[in-house]
């Protein structure tokens, strides 16, 4: 038994300079796991609750001392002496003790930090890398793959202070033979994009996720400058590199219409916005669109899935919020064909693994994702490999909070070699 002997919670700082929760779980034998909770900017209304103090005199109300107190108090007391290898049991104790549907008593930030720290401590006690322990928890021991990265090289929406409505314009180096080469390709395009933007007199400051955040004439112009950068880097768009977008459409959904500032404040219906996106997919090799409509617009999503679902990957983020109850309903209604996995949306490792399994069993793809507020914690890299999810979204080629995940993936690929293939385009729904 890997008995838990000490649990520590503390307040640390995330990549936006806001506080977040870090937890340590100590086991008999000196094994320690440490993990931090990330934090989102464009959040789904049905996400598990991130507990903030609300004391305006401290961190502008964003302090997390209440969540930290939950870790050091009731959570620690409840799991001391328990077996860290029983991840589902540890998570259940915390969830039951919290006693709310959305973890609002202790905060998903408290429960998740402990959940992940526990998994890391258990992995250490078994002498396993975290990805191998996760594969065992997932019921798929030894089954690994390296994920195709979605690299967010132009940031808009809630992630940047610019006039671009669509939140993320991403490249996927699908033609790479390995993850390491995919990272190289992404890096080269990123640097060529800076040159393209500078040549047009545009800003090369970066947004929350490390992508450039220029003001552009339209949303389509973001795709045009990326296409130029891909060509300048010596790659073929559509063959070596495909494109993906995160609309985060809930952020510009007003009174039943999609209002795009970058398109002259034009208001679109669900059907019109679906066809606006469809036109972009005809002009550019966009193979994945995330949150193409508002999280509550299920009727619109059914239409969008009918129009685009057999051609491209339609990813639900705010739509599904990593929640199996909501995902189950989406699967039954034929809504989207992929889920974005953010473990702080649901608040525990066990529930995250359940969402990935449900998606895969239904023929949906699962894209492992960071949040816009991140730390140096690279657990999502191990999660992507350990579940053989196939795709990962972890930002651009700048900011250490993003690059930490790519570097961890490079290390894992080196360790696993041929045991963890990089499957490229085949991982993306509709592209096999």
Swiss-Prot record:
Group of enzyme by EC: lyase
Annotated binding of (2R)-2-phosphoglycerate, by residue: 167, 342, 371-372, 393
Binding residues for Mg(2+): 246, 290, 317
Molecular function, one GO term: magnesium ion binding
InterPro entries recorded: Enolase (IPR000941), Enolase-like_C_sf (IPR036849), Enolase-like_N (IPR029017), Enolase_C (IPR020810), Enolase_CS (IPR020809), Enolase_N (IPR020811)
Biological processes per GO annotation: glycolytic process
Alphabetical UniProt keywords: Cytoplasm, Glycolysis, Lyase, Magnesium, Metal-binding, Secreted
Subcellular location: Cytoplasm; Secreted; Cell surface
UniProt-listed Enzyme Commission number(s): 4.2.1.11
Free-text cofactor note: Binds a second Mg(2+) ion via substrate during catalysis.
PROSITE patterns: ENOLASE (PS00164)
Superkingdom of the source species: Bacteria
Assigned protein family: Belongs to the enolase family.
Subunit structure, interactors included: Component of the RNA degradosome, a multiprotein complex involved in RNA processing and mRNA degradation.
Protein's UniProt name: Enolase
UniProt organism field: Klebsiella pneumoniae subsp. pneumoniae (strain ATCC 700721 / MGH 78578)
């Amino acid at each position: 038994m890997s008995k838990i002997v000490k649990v520590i919670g503390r307040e640390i700082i995330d990549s936006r300079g806001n506080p977040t929760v870090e937890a340590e779980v100590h086991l008999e034998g000196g094994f320690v796991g440490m993990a931090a909770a990330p934090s989102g900017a464009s959040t789904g209304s049905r996400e598990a609750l991130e507990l903030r103090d609300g004391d305006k005199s401290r961190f502008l109300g964003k302090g997390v001392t209440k969540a930290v107190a939950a870790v050091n108090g009731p959570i620690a007391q409840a799991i001391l002496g328990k077996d860290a290898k029983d991840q589902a049991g540890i998570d259940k104790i915390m969830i039951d003790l919290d006693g709310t549907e959305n973890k609002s008593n202790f905060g998903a930030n408290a429960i998740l930090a402990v959940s992940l720290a526990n998994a890391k401590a258990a992995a250490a006690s078994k002498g396993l890398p975290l990805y191998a322990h996760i594969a065992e928890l997932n019921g798929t021991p030894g089954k690994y793959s390296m994920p195709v990265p979605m690299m967010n090289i132009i940031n808009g929406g809630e992630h940047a202070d610019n006039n671009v409505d669509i939140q993320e314009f991403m490249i996927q180096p699908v033609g790479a033979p390995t993850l390491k080469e995919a990272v190289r390709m992404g890096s080269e395009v990123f640097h060529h994009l800076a040159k393209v933007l500078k040549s047009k007199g545009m800003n090369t400051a970066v947004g929350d996720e490390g992508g450039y955040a220029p003001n552009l004439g339209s949303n389509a112009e973001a795709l045009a400058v990326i296409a130029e950068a891909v060509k300048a880097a010596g790659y073929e768009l559509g063959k070596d590199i495909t494109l993906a977008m995160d609309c985060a459409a809930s952020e510009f959904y007003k009174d039943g219409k999609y209002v795009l500032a970058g398109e002259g404040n034009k208001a679109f219906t669900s059907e019109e916005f679906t066809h606006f996106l469809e036109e972009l997919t005809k002009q550019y090799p966009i193979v994945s669109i995330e949150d193409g409509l508002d999280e509550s617009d299920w009727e619109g999503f059914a239409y969008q899935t009918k129009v685009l679902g057999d051609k491209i990957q339609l990813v639900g983020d705010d739509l599904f919020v990593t929640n199996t109850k909501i995902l189950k309903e989406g699967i039954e209604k034929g809504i989207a064909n992929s889920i974005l996995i953010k473990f702080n949306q649901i608040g525990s490792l066990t529930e995250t693994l359940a969402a990935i399994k449900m998606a895969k069993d239904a023929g949906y793809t699962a894209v492992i994702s960071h949040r816009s507020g991140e730390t140096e914690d690279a657990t999502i890299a191990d999660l992507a490999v350990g579940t053989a999810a196939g795709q990962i979204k972890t930002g651009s080629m700048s900011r250490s909070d993003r690059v930490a995940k790519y570097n961890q993936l490079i290390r894992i690929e080196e360790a696993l070699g041929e045991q963890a293939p990089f499957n490229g385009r085949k991982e993306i729904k509709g592209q096999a």
